[in-house]
Structures are given as C-alpha cells and as structure tokens.
Amino acid sequence: MSQEKYIMAIDQGTTSSRAIIFNKKGEKVSSSQKEFTQIFPQAGWVEHNANEIWNSVQSVIAGAFIESGVKPNQIEAIGITNQRETTVVWDKKTGLPIYNAIVWQSRQTAPLAEQLKSQGYVEKFHEKTGLIIDAYFSATKVRWILDHVEGAQERAEKGELLFGTIDTWLVWKLTDGAAHVTDYSNAARTMLYNIKELKWDDEILEILNIPKAILPEVRSNSEIYGKTAPFHFYGGEVPISGMAGDQQAALFGQLAFEPGMVKNTYGTGSFIIMNTGEEMQLSENNLLTTIGYGINGKVYYALEGSIFIAGSAIQWLRDGLRMVENSPESEKYARDSHNNDEVYVVPAFTGLGAPYWNQNARGSVFGLTRGTSKEDFIKATLQSIAYQVRDIIDTMQMDTQTAIQVLKVDGGAAMNNFLMQFQADILGIDIARAKNLETTALGAAFLAGLSVGYWKDLDELKLLNETGELFEPSMNESRKEQLYKGWKKAVKATQVFAEVDD
C-alpha cells in the first residue's frame, strides 16, 4: 500500500464538510465528515462562519488520513466541490472575512433583488448570466456585505478585499493566499458572469457597483489551480486540480457527458441538471441556464431546476416536528400510511424555487381530515419532493423539446426506496440510482484526476460508476395525473395565500 496513489475530494456542503479519499477504481477508501454551525440572525437569513468552514475542512482532511493510513505524499491531486452561491468577502492582507458567509438559502438580500427587477433588469441579466434575478445568487449578497460593513466599499475599490464563493475561499486558504481563482460552474452562479462570453460582465458590475478588483480569476473545471501550502496539508505540496459547484460535480460524477442526460441530487435542496451540450440554451419557462463544466478547451452548458427544500423537509420532520427519530425511518412510516394520497404538503419554507420562483410563499398543508395520521403526513412530505421534481422535469421537456427517458439520481434521500418508487411513478420514467451515491465528491475527484493523468480520459471514467438500482414506474396514467393535478392545486393555493394584501 505504501506507494499506491489516490485522489482526495473535499466536499464542502451546506451543513457539513467532508474529505473523501478515492482509489483508481473510483472506490471510497476513507472519509471524514464534520458539521458546522448554522447561523440565523433573523427570520429567513442563513449565514456561516467562513473561518469555521475552513477549520472543519482542515479537520476532515486529517480525519481521512487517519482513517485510511494514507500519507499526504500518496495523494496525487485534490478536487474541490462546494455549496454554490454562498458568498465570502475577506481582507486580502489578514485573510479574515469581514462578515459571515451569506448562504445560498438566505433571503436577506431579497429587497435588493426586487429593486433590480423593478428597475427593469430581468431580461438583461437573463441573457447575460442565464439566471433569473433572485437573492439566491451571489451578486446581491456581495452588494449587501459591501453596503452593511463599514468602509467595505472603499476598501474593495482600493483592492484591499477579495470576494469568492466557497471554492475560491478554500483554494485561497489551502494555497496560503497564492491562488485567487474560481471555475466556470461556480462563476456561472454569481449572477456577475457572462456565460456566453465567458467573462465577468462589466455592465452588471457597474449596475451593482461591485469593483472588479475583488473578483477571482475564472478557470476551467479540470486544471492545476495551485498547490497546497505544506503546513496546511501535513507536509504535502499537492496540486489542487479539479473544481466544480456541487450540482455540476454530481452531473460529472454521474457520467452525464452526453447532451440530453439528466441527473437529480436529493440533498438539502434538490437540483436537477440536464447537459445541453456546447450550445447555450435560454429557458422560456423559468429554469436556469448555467455552465455544466468546461474541460479540454470546451464548455458544456446545462439547464437547471432548483428545489430549495428536499432532504431538509425530512430533517424538519425529525428536528422540527419530532415525528421521526432519524431520516431513514420516514420510509417505514410512509409505507404504513394507508390513505388515498389526498394530503399534500407544500414545503415552501424559504419560498418556491423553479419553475415558480415565488420568494414570498411559505409552507402549507392541504387535505387534512380528522382521520389523517402521522404516517399520512410523513408520506405526503416525501411525496412533495417527488412532485417538485416532476414540475422541473416537465419544464425541461418543454424547453428542450426532448422526451427524458431516464433520470439518474444520487444524494442522501435517493436512499429512500419509497421516495424513488413514487418518483418513478409520478414521472412515468425509469429512475437509475447510482451504485456509488458519492457522485458529488466523485465528480470532483474525476475532474482532479483527469487533469494530472491519474485517469486517462472520459472513456476510462465511464467504467467507474454504473447504475446500482433501477426503479420502474408502476402507477397507471389516470391515477398519476390525478395526483399531480392535486399537487398543482396545492401550489396554486400556497401562492394565493402568500399574496401581499393591499
């Protein structure tokens, strides 16, 4: 074992950081995970302490080495994947953040987003960035920090501050400030990057008054960005050579290299991405156009639908309502429910994502009767995840005029067999669950390994992550459509309830 080589993936997520060591077969050799604090300064605000994130990453790197006995000099390369859009602004000299990281879920910049919309910028931003104007993306978060931290705008203009999404922050820390870089997939989520021209957009920067000096350099998803400073990697100087936002990394880890391939990751939120090839395709139905990945001098675009609440709805059942002891238990309860699926939960806790984009909507429940049981409620919560996925798959098919035949799935909630079967039923297509559910980390490892020759090419990768289980639809058409119609009514009613009174 002494001289076998490995790839390390650092997967910095919304609630925890992980380091995973993979071997040449794409198998997990060891992993380490550490949760960190979620900060909620006000209703709807979500923040993280960027230093705590960095500490958690250092801790899991150590943990992965300890668990496996692998030495730092056996790591051929490091791949990074991260929660996207989450925004850090820090002091170039001290390396200290000037404010907490504002998390992708946070709605604290919603008034800024509304202001941009009312000023008539929707079309312009969509054409340039592929995104809709929303507090979800980094642009308004950067503006908010520069507005709310005393002297920040002035310091930014003087070039004393740096901005980055979490990938940028981690590379900057790991290289001890030698590299201030991001990749196509993360840059595409800032709402500051022109995805057609592949550059920071001067006009948008001017509209938001964000100084260009604070922005990182944008690079491809598979190349050497820098090397670890030995004192941050237990004596090792290892190339950091692959980087992608978590959802794009999962697309790559699912081996969705062909246009028309679609994957869904059931994480905290649920994110459905379709590879649309080298042509940028703007959605007419409120999906996001983004960059899937850029590799070997080519850029592959993607359509994406974001669902804000998926796995976190199960966490809510566990922590908020205390209906289940642990997440897997939700499957048992759902199977014990014998109602006729007339209960609908719309988990719009932080608004509705694609294709509705209603940031004022809040969670609601419909169809309760005196006979409704805890089991029925848990089942309806699981079903809400599948209904939201159907909303997006239907929209993708409209946008691209293609019939999606199979959905590749991964992420924590993809382990729930009840949910996967109901997903197949309500979509009427096959659900292919990856054998290796670590597709996000695997994608980052693949990108890193390719750029240093650890794996030769995409064909070699295709042998490494086959389908683990296939779920085929078994519900008849009229029942499927009747259930989905009920969901559409529930969403409509939720939006009516959220309307602002005159």
Swiss-Prot record:
Modification after translation = The phosphoenolpyruvate-dependent sugar phosphotransferase system (PTS), including enzyme I, and histidine-containing protein (HPr) are required for the phosphorylation, which leads to the activation of the enzyme.
Positions with a binding annotation for sn-glycerol 3-phosphate: 14, 84-85, 136, 246
Entry keywords, A to Z = ATP-binding, Glycerol metabolism, Kinase, Nucleotide-binding, Phosphoprotein, Transferase
UniProt catalytic activity: glycerol + ATP = sn-glycerol 3-phosphate + ADP + H(+)
Outline what the protein does. Key enzyme in the regulation of glycerol uptake and metabolism. Catalyzes the phosphorylation of glycerol to yield sn-glycerol 3-phosphate.
Gene Ontology MF annotations: ATP binding; glycerol kinase activity
What InterPro entries does its record include? ATPase_NBD (IPR043129), Carb_kinase_FGGY (IPR000577), Carb_kinase_FGGY_CS (IPR018483), FGGY_C (IPR018485), FGGY_N (IPR018484), Glycerol_kin (IPR005999)
Pathway assignment: Polyol metabolism; glycerol degradation via glycerol kinase pathway; sn-glycerol 3-phosphate from glycerol: step 1/1
Lineage: superkingdom: Bacteria
Per the UniProt record, which EC number(s) apply here? Answer: 2.7.1.30
Protein name, per record? Glycerol kinase
Q: How is its activity regulated?
A: Activated by phosphorylation and inhibited by fructose 1,6-bisphosphate (FBP).
Q: What GO biological process terms does the UniProt entry carry, in alphabetical order?
A: glycerol catabolic process; glycerol metabolic process; glycerol-3-phosphate metabolic process
Q: Where does ADP bind?
A: 14, 18, 268, 311, 412, 416
* Top-level class of the enzyme under EC nomenclature: transferase
Please tell me where ATP binds in this chain. Answer: 14-16, 268, 311, 315, 412
* Gene field: glpK
Mind telling me which CDD domains this protein's record contains? Answer: FGGY_EcGK_like (cd07786)
Protein family membership: Belongs to the FGGY kinase family.
Q: How is this protein organized at the quaternary level? A: Homotetramer and homodimer (in equilibrium).
Q: So where does glycerol get bound?
A: 84-85, 136, 246-247
List the Pfam families hit by this protein, alphabetically: FGGY_C, FGGY_N
Modified positions (Phosphohistidine) are 232
